[in-house]
Amino acid sequence: MAYQAKLRVWRGDEDGGALQDFSVDVNEGEVVLDIIHRLQQTQAGDLAVRWNCKAGKCGSCSAEINGRPKLLCMTRMSTFDPAETITITPLRTFPVIRDLVTDVSFNYEKAREIPSFTPPKDLQPGEYRMMQEDVERSQEFRKCIECFLCQNTCHVVRDHEENKKAFAGPRYLMRQTELDMHPLDTHDHRAVQAQDENGLGFCNITKCCTEVCPEHIKITDNALIPLKERAADRKYDPVVWLGNKLFRRG
């Protein structure tokens, strides 16, 4: 059933802005991104929003809806009371470019800090072999669509801008975990590197990153906590230390 929704949408740029009120038609089955597009068509032709696939697979349309990080294309209007006012704002952790579009280059800088997969030197392409159970261990992490909702909601950088230089964020700590689990990766001590160089110690496992993940990846339980455990083992367990000396990979 169609109805008129009340929206408050943040309008502005890097120099500042404010929430602007709108009333817009909503049809059955629509998502928030549909309503933003209708606003562009009928009332705010210059409203800036980043989007691409409209299928929850590209991660482009990340924003905050009523203060909670979400994908605009995966948030159905039917989840809201028709009488409530829906507030849509840009991702708070990243600098605003214009309206709902933010500069997420922080994440690409952090991606470059993570050493890439390092295969054994004596193996040629086409010679890599893995057990299926090893493939499945990190399969969950490869579902990431890099929407950066986890990066945005993590209070380590959301509430503390000064931590950005030292903290890679849950998405890229998860990447370290994925590679550390890979049986053919020969890069030494990724878990220790995550602790010493990527700010793993800043994470206090509040699970806020897991809660906002649209792919339902258990980032905290399956990536961050195991990475913390391996970092502690490799730095402080004398048996593990001796084993690493005797049986160093690569």
Where are these regions (language model features)?
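Iron-sulfur-associated redox domains of electron-transfer enzymes in respiratory
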Residues: A2-N107, F141, Q151, H155, ...
